[in-house]
Amino acid sequence: LDPKVVQSLL
């Protein structure tokens, strides 16, 4: 997964 997607989930 892209870092941006991960941050969005957090």
From Swiss-Prot:
The modification Leucine amide is found at L10. It is found in: Secreted; Target cell membrane. Expressed by the venom gland. Keywords: Amidation, Membrane, Secreted, Target cell membrane, Target membrane. It comes from the Eukaryota. GO terms for cellular component: extracellular region; membrane; other organism cell membrane. Negative results: has no activity against fungi (B.cinerea and C.albicans) and bacteria (E.coli and S.aureus). Has no hemolytic activity against human erythrocytes. Does not show cytolytic activity against insect cell lines. Does not induce feeding disorder in lepidopteran larvae after peptide injection in the vicinity of the head and thorax. Belongs to the MCD family. This is Venom peptide 4.
